[in-house]
Swiss-Prot record:
It is an enzyme of class 2 (transferase). One of its GO terms (cellular component) is cytosol. Its EC number is 2.7.1.71. Substrate binds at D33, R57, G79, R136. HAMAP family: Shikimate_kinase (MF_00109). Mg(2+) binds at T15. PROSITE patterns: SHIKIMATE_KINASE. Keywords: Amino-acid biosynthesis, Aromatic amino acid biosynthesis, ATP-binding, Cytoplasm, Kinase, Magnesium, Metal-binding, Nucleotide-binding, Transferase. The gene is aroK. InterPro entries: P-loop_NTPase, Shikimate/glucono_kinase, Shikimate_kinase/TSH1, Shikimate_kinase_CS. Catalyzes the specific phosphorylation of the 3-hydroxyl group of shikimic acid using ATP as a cosubstrate. Pathway: Metabolic intermediate biosynthesis; chorismate biosynthesis; chorismate from D-erythrose 4-phosphate and phosphoenolpyruvate: step 5/7. GO terms for molecular function: ATP binding; magnesium ion binding; shikimate kinase activity. This is Shikimate kinase.
Length: 171
């Protein structure tokens, strides 16, 4: 079976929804950021701090290659995976790519519960979210299906992901 690839900006629920979908479909779950952390032996925030974004993106590309070779997985990608077109090519080979998107204020509310968001360690995080969303918008167009999660529960999003996957997996 093809993989389900969840992509989108940080704080859109990729990991939470991905785990729920994986459980429902009896798939395995993998998070590319967690794979990067395992490869580096440190957190994403530490990688950014000690080695910079470019080094992180190299590790991320290796994680994407590894994850894309799997079968029957729900793959939650890091928010910036889309910035490298070769990542999309890899993930599409054996996956249906579903974009989870949300309004900036929803993203800010969701990520304010967590720390270790190196790209948002700025004075005005909502403004930075808007800038990054605008910058990434062209890259998000590659998705096979898009879900606006802003006003939906985790369960509703998971159900929509499953419906989209069933519809698109045979193409």
């Amino acid at each position: 079976m093809k993989n389900i690839v969840l992509t989108g900006f940080m704080g859109t629920g990729k990991t939470t929804v991905g785990k729920k979908v994986a459980t429902t479909l009896h798939f395995n779950f993998i998070d590319t950021d967690k794979l990067v952390e395992k490869m580096a032996g440190m957190s994403v925030a530490e990688i950014f701090e000690k080695h910079g974004e470019e080094y992180f993106r190299k590790l991320e590309k290796a994680a994407v290659i590894k994850a894309s070779r799997l079968k029957n997985h729900v793959i939650a990608t890091g928010g910036g995976v889309v910035l490298n077109p070769s990542n999309i090519v890899q993930l599409r080979k054996n996956g249906v790519i579903i974009l989870l998107k949300a309004r900036p204020e929803v993203i800010l509310r969701n990520i304010s519960k967590t720390k270790d968001r190196p790209l948002l360690a700025v004075e005005d995080p909502e403004k930075r979210i808007r800038e990054l969303l605008e910058e990434r918008e062209p890259f998000y167009r590659f998705a096979d299906y898009t879900i606006d999660v802003s006003d939906k529960t985790i369960e509703e999003v998971a159900e929509e992901v499953i419906r989209a996957y069933i519809k698109l997996k045979g193409r």
